A protein has these predicted regions:
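S-adenosylmethionine-dependent methyltransferases
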Residues: 1-207
Length: 207
């Protein structure tokens, strides 16, 4: 539905992404036909995903030669930036269009150790396993906090490491407080987004 364009995301990586100039216009037209249509938050490279990339470049031991699962991946920038360092990687989102685009980029980059799946963090099948789980700015809706904490805790209890990137917004503290006992490491990043500087915290969660 959303027009895509090939963009240089890093010195080494070009990805197909939704055309930023077209997304709002297309969404506006679609919403006139369906007033309940949710905004495609997946269709943007968010500051949190850029901070996640920086963190994983600085600390690759969290993903090197490991099975990695990115949940709520959207475009999947962190996954694509580390795919060649992992054993296997799953890029997942609940939005089918996001997953279709991820599959296009997997083929574009000729990644044999990578697959994209439609997954809901509330109901991840038990056969989906990972050493490390990536979450970038998934905690934006307070009504989802309890369900997200339950899913995160479930993964921590089976021995997964979780790398979580989140903007410093007013709702962040109540969410992070629910996970306070699992915080192993925190790093802060300043990410330029247009004319703004966004403060992003990256947490490593372990049991």
């Amino acid at each position: 539905v959303y027009p895509i364009t090939l963009e240089q995301i890093s010195p080494e990586i070009f990805l197909w992404i939704p055309d930023p100039a077209a997304v709002k216009t297309v969404y506006k037209n679609l919403k006139e036909q369906n007033s309940n249509l949710p905004f495609p938050f997946w269709a943007k490279v968010w500051a949190s995903s850029k901070a996640m990339v920086s963190f994983l470049q600085e600390e690759p031991h969290w993903i090197k030669n490991k099975i990695v699962l990115e949940i709520g991946a959207g475009i999947g920038l962190p996954s694509f930036s580390i795919a060649n360092k992992t054993s296997n990687i799953i890029i997942s989102d609940y939005d089918r269009e996001a997953v279709a685009l991820a599959n296009k980029n997997i083929a574009h980059l000729n990644l044999s150790n990578c697959k994209a799946l439609v997954l809901d963090w509330n109901d991840i099948p038990e056969h989906i396993i990972a050493d490390t789980i990536l979450l970038s700015d998934t905690n934006y809706n307070p009504t989802d906090f309890d369900a997200l904490v339950i899913s995160i805790t479930k993964f921590l209890n089976i021995g997964c490491n979780i790398v979580l990137a989140t903007p410093n917004r007013i709702t962040t503290n109540p969410f992070i407080e629910k996970l306070n006992g699992f915080i192993h490491k925190t790093k802060n990043y300043s990410i330029i987004e247009g004319a703004l500087e966004k403060e992003i915290a990256v947490f490593v969660l372990k049991k």
